[in-house]
Amino acid sequence: MSENRNGLMELLGGGSLVEYNDQAQKAVMQFEARPEFCHSDGRVVQGGFVTAWMDAAMAHAIRRASQGEYSAVTLELKVTFVSATGPGPVVAEGWVVSMGRTVAFLEGRLFDGAGKLLATSSSTAKLARVNP
């Protein structure tokens, strides 16, 4: 499976996959929370970016867990904002809780560069064949 970066990941602040654990079916990605992603005088990242970072990590977990056969199409996504996210490096984790033939259940977390928990997420995703 290709790990080529695409335009969306660049727009989200880099989006590089830094680790994948086969046993845990867990993807870890790093992003840069840029000042232009922020409101409140540049101190707080807009929640859509926080959500997208965790969604991307969960989608990578599906791609890897299925050996590149499936992509995740989000059906439902819940996010809990634990603490304000500021500019700087952030780490998104996403993992497969359960994967059936057509639907997967996923969870994710977002941390700042010091390891502080910023947000959590859970998602239900439809499995879509990458190359039908």
What do these predicted regions represent?
Residues M1-P132:
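Terminal targeting signals and extreme-terminal segments of soluble enzymes
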